[in-house]
């Protein structure tokens, strides 16, 4: 079943526009009949309630009036459970109606958009279902959101390390995060048992190794730090990397977190992990980005948050400045 796009009624459309004119968050519901429902809510709580949209997804991201939705095609799985399950990749607009759609075999994992909404990136597992799996294989693909056209798999880009071309048959890439200029991005590369942070250039189709041990990077709004998950024995520790000094700061979250985090602002990050109860539903937590404080629930029974900040709204609407 592909991501559905039934237009909102007029009242709902007006409420959506009202929320979109202020800082807000787009996320997935995690419980009950509304599981996977893409939902929008004002960050400051001034909106009387969260607003559901017509889309259902397994992973989403949203920026600059554009979004990407990854969704298992469960109808195909029911018909033939022995085949690969197609994933619907949907690019949608500010009305949460699909603009471009296609399918790809795999398991949905990560999704991101550039700050200006020009490019989208997504990662699927081609084999395996976890980054713990040493035999897993990924595909990470860049898209032009205007046309829906593929800009290539990161495995097709040239990779450089220590000033030399770096090549190996077992490269796996995942977890793209874009800089403000949209051309520059960061991602994870695994070669053998070694994990690297790479910096990418969309136009040059080039990747450069920067640092070791960085999985699922997420660039801060000011472009100075990367939040990521760091392998610590049998778990992942949320950590922040200062790009100027390459100093790493472990965050106060002590639970195992397998997520590509989202920055709420330059001081706090959001991420999904299992609730501290027996139900094991996901919730979105918030924790300071400087290693202080403690984690707290930001959105109960929710996942895959995408934050639209004040400066993002002004970028889209210069008349508001």
Q: Which positions does each model-derived feature cover?
A:
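Sequence signature of WD/YWTD-type beta-propeller architectures
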Residues: 1-321
